[in-house]
């Protein structure tokens, strides 16, 4: 029987999922994106060469591997084709032949982007921190049952009628609520006519193919985007993304039964980061935080925005472990902690009423009111960069990892000590 693995970000995103998915893909028969859009990038380094993927699964660099975009993903056709062109230019073989898109994927079109950007501009100081790429409005259309989906590209004779109804809805909002320019039907149709000939050959019944692969004993790898603490239901709402980022979303977003999900690997940075607005209890505003940002190259791969940095938040991670059923953790960027003399781990929070909790509360207001409770540990001066053996790690680094396990209640399965595929320590292989 095949063993299937779900990879999710266990913090606020940017944990290093792309590298680990690329590494695990060596043993997979298919890699599947199941939620999100092109609002976050996954950075891969293979042989010193960097590749940034936004929509295409991180297994695409393995040139015999099939990759899938499930119905839980909102797809910008223009962004997708741009990404394919980048991979083709880099010499990656048969990208369009190996990439399959579910017919039920909602499409991101110019009016989604226009509304997303107009809304964010009108929020003033209350900005959520959206990337302005149309992700939220596309998910709104899905729920409101007015989405244009990938399958609609196969029926151009019916598509224009659907679009006319959508234009009326969007242009009222753009013009009258946000004082922005309307979107012209001919501009959107021009985009669709340009992308459809390349998109339609990739449209496939993804759910059926994945289930067939599973029956044939092939291992499947489900790749999440963003992070659990940005989940639309369980994140620090409203400072969240527009989709469910949890392991459970892999089932609905890919079209497989939950019994097919055997192992949940939570990707966890050795410190904590967050992009954009929203509460962040362990955020650092001193030279330690600046040092983490500099050594960790903490800038968004898609937006270029600087990431906020802070101490490891075990209480937040406990919430993520709980809501995802994490089987094992992969600790990334351990090498960024090299040289930090004294390390703090947040093990809980003081609450406004004088009480304490050892797990992240629900909602941004409750999290904003939390004051972190720290345990202090000695750091290490030795370099962990590129170390490939657990025994070769400094004693204090091993003690740090052990304490994370103890406080969070989940085992460390993998340790990443650098951006390259090979800079990885394996304690327990998720596919084993």
Curated annotation (Swiss-Prot):
Key words of the record: Cytoplasm, GTP-binding, Ligase, Magnesium, Metal-binding, Nucleotide-binding, Purine biosynthesis
GO molecular function, one term: magnesium ion binding
Residues given in the record as GTP binding sites: 13-19, 41-43, 307, 333-335, 416-418
GO-annotated cellular components: cytoplasm
Binding site for IMP: 14-17, 39-42, 131, 145, 226, 241, 305
InterPro entries per the UniProt record, alphabetical: Adenylosuccin_syn_GTP-bd, Adenylosuccin_syn_Lys_AS, Adenylosuccinate_synth_dom1, Adenylosuccinate_synth_dom2, Adenylosuccinate_synth_dom3, Adenylosuccinate_synthetase, P-loop_NTPase
Listed PROSITE patterns: ADENYLOSUCCIN_SYN_1, ADENYLOSUCCIN_SYN_2
Keyword Transmembrane applies: no
Enzyme Commission number(s) from the entry: 6.3.4.4
Binding sites annotated in the UniProt record for substrate: 301-307
Superkingdom of this protein's organism: Bacteria
GO BP annotation list: 'de novo' AMP biosynthetic process; IMP metabolic process
Residues in coiled coil: none
Protein residues bound to Mg(2+): 14, 41
Active site as annotated: 14 (proton acceptor), 42 (proton donor)
Cellular localization per UniProt: Cytoplasm
Cofactor note: Binds 1 Mg(2+) ion per subunit.
The keyword Cytoplasm belongs to this UniProt entry's keyword annotation: yes
Main enzyme class: ligase
Subunit record text: Homodimer.
NCBIfam families: PRK01117.1 (NF002223), purA (TIGR00184)
Function text: Plays an important role in the de novo pathway of purine nucleotide biosynthesis. Catalyzes the first committed step in the biosynthesis of AMP from IMP.
Family of the protein in this entry: Belongs to the adenylosuccinate synthetase family.
Protein name: Adenylosuccinate synthetase
Organism: Neisseria meningitidis serogroup A / serotype 4A (strain DSM 15465 / Z2491)
